[in-house]
A protein has these predicted regions:
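Structural microenvironment flanking redox-active thiols in thiol-disulfide oxidoreductases
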Residues: 48-58, 85
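Typically the conserved alpha-helix immediately C-terminal to a functionally engaged Cys/Sec
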Residues: 26-39
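Short pre-active-site segment immediately N-terminal to redox-active cysteine/selenocysteine motifs
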Residues: 10-13, 17-21, 64
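Non-catalytic, surface beta->alpha helical segment in thiol-disulfide oxidoreductase systems
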Residues: 64, 69-98
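A short beta-strand-turn-helix
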Residues: 1-13
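A short glycine-leucine-enriched loop at secondary-structure breakpoints
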Residues: 59-63
């Protein structure tokens, strides 16, 4: 499952699993773009379209949208389900960039 791996990249990563039909996902889009700009060069941001990447969603155990993985270098992911952008900057600051 998505929690059983250790990431070995050189920058922390945020992975956003989303879909065009998901209202909360679409409302989250501008906030995620804002965060990607704010942390440019420090954190890598990826978006995964759940409709196009069903196997990837299954592999990572994604069952609801939006689901975000906050992955520190050399650490296990912090998984957030639902559109709660007020928590995201705190997770990035306290968990990914510590």
């Amino acid at each position: 499952t998505g929690n059983d791996f250790v990431y070995n990249g050189d920058k922390p990563v945020v992975v956003d699993f989303w879909a065009t039909w998901c209202g909360p996902c679409m409302r989250l889009l501008p906030k995620m773009e804002e965060l990607a700009e704010k942390y440019k060069g420090k954190v890598m941001f990826y978006k995964v379209n759940a409709d196009k990447e069903k196997d990837l969603c299954k592999h990572f155990g994604v069952q609801a949208l939006p689901t975000l993985f906050f992955i520190p270098v050399g650490g296990k992911p912090i998984i957030e389900v639902g559109a709660t952008p007020e928590k995201y900057m705190q997770i990035i600051e306290e968990q990914l960039l510590k």
